[in-house]
A protein has these predicted regions:
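Short, structured loop/turn "capping" segments at alpha-beta junctions
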Residues: 13-17, 47-54, 120, 174
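Conserved protein-kinase catalytic-loop segment immediately C-terminal to the catalytic Asp
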Residues: 16, 68, 127-130
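A short beta-turn/loop motif at secondary-structure boundaries
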Residues: 22, 58-61, 129-134
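Phosphate-binding site of ATP-dependent enzymes
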Residues: 24-113, 117
């Protein structure tokens, strides 16, 4: 199954494999070959055959960007440099967050990604394109229960306060 999924990606190794239940960079794997892909999938399914897996094209980068979206607006952003000796950029894994200003295109694409999952409170993670002004970023993940670790440090904002104030306002409540 994994090899069939890889073939549909229309890419080359290495690829990124993610378990859909992971967080903070746990369950994210760098897969270098078909043999490795097969072995990793066998190991994961031996532990839990109901584990959902996602394969993504590997895009080399020095950093990714996390965008917190709240109520259809960008709340805060941070640049997450790739950890030395690793391919991940999660703050929980050791990345040191930095401030970043998004382009209009990056804002537009982040809001579009959040809207695609009907997210009121989401984080959109992306790898910026080479030409940030003219080419859309590569969205790599949209989180419906986002971590905010490092965001206050990078943005200088009181994220928790802003989230509480948003949801305390009844006009922002969503009917279910």
């Amino acid at each position: 199954k994994a090899v069939l999924a890889f073939d549909k990606l229309d890419t080359k190794f290495p690829v990124i494999m993610k378990t859909l239940r992971g967080s903070k960079g746990v369950g994210v794997l760098f897969v270098e070959s078909e043999k490795s892909l097969d072995s990793i999938v066998q190991l994961i399914y031996k532990q839990d055959e109901d584990t959902d897996l996602l394969l993504q094209e590997y895009i080399p980068t020095d950093y990714d960007v996390r965008v917190l979206v709240l109520g259809g607006k960008v709340l805060a952003t941070m640049k997450r440099p790739v950890i030395e000796g690793d391919f991940r950029s999660n703050v929980s894994q050791g990345s040191k967050p930095e401030k970043i200003k998004l382009t209009e295109l990056e804002i537009e694409e982040s809001l579009k990604a959040a809207k695609a999952v009907n997210g009121v409170w989401t984080a959109v993670d992306f790898i910026p394109s080479k030409n940030r002004e003219k080419e859309p970023p590569f969205v790599i993940e949209v989180n419906s229960s986002p971590g905010t670790e490092g965001m206050e440090e990078a943005s200088g904002q009181n994220i928790s306060k802003e989230i509480i104030e948003f949801f305390a306002d009844k006009k922002n409540w969503v009917k279910v």
